[in-house]
Amino acid sequence: MEMKKRLTLELRNKKPGEVKELVLDNCRSDDGKIVGLSSDFENLEFLSMINVNLLSISNLPKLNKLRKLELSDNRISGGLEVLAERTPNLTHLNLSGNKIKDINTLEPLKKLPNLHSLDLFNCEVTMLINYRESVFTLLPQLTYLDGFDADEQEAPDSDPEADGDGLEDEYENGEGEEEEDDDEEDDLDEEVIDEEDDEDDDLEGEEEEDGVDDEEEDEEEDGEDEEDDEADDDLPRGEKRKRNLEDEGEEDPEDEEDDEDD
């Protein structure tokens, strides 16, 4: 697919100014030059043109916000001064698999003060003696060359600055704080529920104790009644009858007869 058609397809009815990332890998460029890309892509931060048969980047438009440029597996041999003029805020540049042969070709990159990472894998320049030392000396602003720093420490898999993860991290941290607040509220709710459950348990325990006390009192009263009945059973028949009448508020007929005799 031609680069111009691919560019139209990638836009997907968006305006160029709305695009922040653009991938044009493996399409065909006309005469080895960039086609269709303009300064209307004013908010573009990431541009990838891998294996598009580029010979020159002279047609690269002014892209002030561009931070990461992927140009690997092309046939670029020079003309890098265009980058300093049109992509002044570039932080990552990948020129792997191009025709870069000597250190002097990289000299224009000195004018990119924010250049943080440079990749030159499979370029002839990497075969030069003291290649790494020479590049770090020429470009002191570099942190990583071909994925490693000057002390041979490997670069992290992703760089928050280049990938635009800084804002995402802040957003995630904000969400994390909200989640922590939610967790604290949940914990407080659980504590309140536990306290209410404990109060309910205490009330139930008190009610059970009251029930036990009432049962014991009833049993004691029943026991007293039974003792009274047993005592009554032990009385002689006449006295028992008399006692029952007294309890009922009546007089014994025999007593009445005695009164009459008197």
From Swiss-Prot:
Modification comment: Directly cleaved by caspase-3/CASP3.
Record-level GO cellular component terms: collagen-containing extracellular matrix; nucleus; protein-containing complex
Motif Nuclear localization signal: chain residues: 240-243
SUPFAM superfamilies: L domain-like
A molecular-function term among this protein's GO annotations: protein-containing complex binding
Cross-referenced Pfam families: LRR_9
Domain LRRCT: 123-161
Compartments where located: Nucleus
Biased composition (Acidic residues): 150-233, 247-262
Record keywords: Chaperone, Leucine-rich repeat, Nucleus, Repeat
InterPro entries, A to Z: AN32, Leu-rich_rpt, LRR_dom_sf
UniProt function note: Multifunctional protein that is involved in the regulation of many processes including cell proliferation, apoptosis, cell cycle progression or transcription. Regulates the proliferation of neuronal stem cells, differentiation of leukemic cells and progression from G1 to S phase of the cell cycle. As negative regulator of caspase-3-dependent apoptosis, may act as an antagonist of ANP32A in regulating tissue homeostasis. Exhibits histone chaperone properties, able to recruit histones to certain promoters, thus regulating the transcription of specific genes.
Family of the protein in this entry: Belongs to the ANP32 family.
Comment on protein domains: Histone binding is mediated by the concave surface of the LRR region.
Subunit structure: Interacts with histones H3 and H4. Interacts with KLF5; this interaction induces promoter region-specific histone incorporation and inhibition of histone acetylation by ANP32B.
Protein name per UniProt: Acidic leucine-rich nuclear phosphoprotein 32 family member B
Organism: Gallus gallus
